[in-house]
Every structure is written in structure tokens, then in C-alpha cells.
Amino acid sequence: PVLALGLTKLIKPSRKIDETNINITNSWLSVNNWLIDQVLPQLKWHISVEDGLDLNLQGRYLMTCNHQSWVDTTVAQYFGLTRMPLTRFFTKWELIFIPFVGQAFKILGFPMMKRHTKAQIAKNPELKYRDLEEARKSCQQLLSQPFTLLNYLEGTRFSPEKHAKQQSPYQNLLKPKAGGLALALNILENEIDAL
């Protein structure tokens, strides 16, 4: 349904289509959360929210998270489903080629980033600015609706190999990369209700 509505959005953009897609996605996430509760009934969640932080489904939030495993996004969605707007996060452009998943990311307004190597940027410095412009446009598109934008400060999932290669000063974390967060704050700073 999300993809079909997304195609109609190409012909005639509509806030109603966006809202319907969000509702469909939230229904799917509700089923996912129910499945998690069934498969892991003894799971104990320890999630803390800053005192006085008033989260709501109509808010605009920027969320940061360490990226320990592929489960991180599932946990963020589980936590946020009834507390915050749909959680979106920066994704790799290459995911657009995964049938259904990549297209759903695009339709739902997930900011998609192309990754360029240092060698590619050195050869063509414009690539760096082109990607920043795409990220800026993606962030600005979020402003037409309530949103939660998740930023993994480490930029990639933790692994012992990456940790050793980076010589991270942190025991269980990679070195943070502030670029994505700085970009989002720069674009959204006056529009977010909480970080």
C-alpha cells in the first residue's frame, strides 16, 4: 500500500497521502512490536527519557543513538511508536535498489545519502557538496509534518575490527562523527521541539 500511494504522490503530491502512508507504516510497526512481545515475552526494556521532556505524536524531534547492532533501529521504532512521530534515519542511497524497502524509505521521507570515498571526493570535490545539498533537501521535506530524525553519531555499526582500526578512546563505542548531526541541527534548529 505504501508503494502504491507513493506512486500517486509522484503524480499529485498530497499531505493526505503522506498521512495515510505514515498510518500504514505505524500499523505495520504495531504488528512488529506485537511480534517482538510474543517472541521475547521476558524482555525487560530500560528506556529513560529526560525529566520534563514532553514527547508527543505531533512533535518534531532529533534523536541521537549509538549504533551497536542492526537491532538499534527496531528498538528506536519500538520505543517511539506511541510516543513520537515515525522515526526516520539517514540511510545509504544504495538501499534504493532493494525491492520495496528502498522505495518505502524514499516515499516515507528517509534522508538518503550517497557515500563517496575520500579518493572520489579528492578527484571530484563537488561530490561532497552535492551530497550535503541532497541531505539538506531531505531534512527540509520533513518540515511539512511531525517527525523524529534519528542520527547514529558513529555513522556505522560497532565492530571490534572498526573499533581497533579507529583506535577509539571509548571502550564500547566508535568515534562519533558530528557531520550528520551538525547538518540536521543547522537545517532544523528552529523547527525541533527537542533533541
Give the label of every model feature segment:
Residues 1-61, 75:
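Membrane-anchoring hydrophobic helices of lipid-metabolizing enzymes
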